[in-house]
Curated annotation (Swiss-Prot):
Subunit organization: Monomer.
Annotated protein name in UniProt: Pimeloyl-[acyl-carrier protein] methyl ester esterase
PANTHER family from the UniProt entry: AB HYDROLASE SUPERFAMILY PROTEIN YCLE (PTHR43798:SF31), MONOACYLGLYCEROL LIPASE (PTHR43798)
Keyword Glycoprotein among record annotations: no
EC number annotated for this UniProt entry: 3.1.1.85
Pathway(s) per entry: Cofactor biosynthesis; biotin biosynthesis
Amino acid sequence: MSTNLHWQSFGQGPDLVLLHGWGMNGAVWQQTVESLQPYFRVHVVDLPGYGHSAESHAEDLAKIADLVLQDAPEKAVWLGWSLGGLVATHIALNAPQRVSKLITVASSPKFAAERPWRGIQPNVLTAFTDQLLEDFSVTIERFMALQAMGSPSARKDVKQLKQAVLSRPQPNPDSLLVGLNILADVDLRDALTSLSMPMLRLYGRLDGLVPIKVASDLNEQLPSTQQFVFNQSSHAPFMTEHEAFCLQVREFAA
């Protein structure tokens, strides 16, 4: 089992690390990298069990974070999308000396709904887990459709996500299961108040996985953080409203 993850670095400038979400790989960032590399040294990793890191495996969030930190820049702005946002947040909480600023995209400190907290219904996550054990390619396809649902460019977004996934080795089913367990079980809400670095939270108004109510709930809990909502986006604002997304990142990370 390999402990080395697949990294790619582009451009020159301050270090910026991009972390992808569940079922995906670093290829989802291709367009983002092209737009940001004139301003940053952009580092893209395939998380353990995904893409070119499919031979690696980590059994929980802490182990994923440890493997990612092994070859990451000494200090960087960290940006995590969806599940990647949990990984980036975990790193910011447990290795704050490595994180100058934190950006989360369509992410939540707790993905599973638990009244009054909004999120993914636990039975949806359970259904994904059951489906995963039967046919993981169908599961990923359903998840992609769910991510784009509501976005005016849903069909285009799904196509882009699909192309990214298919351009690299398929994810390791064990790692997919670990990821679903993290989405179902992890709760970083209380820990967030101890974050020491500047934080920007980016959301899609039409997101069906991270309801927009999460943004306002966290505004109350984290008044010193910044947030921005993309009005036309669902779960992948970096695709749906690409230019506006890159502008938010540039202004905050500079």
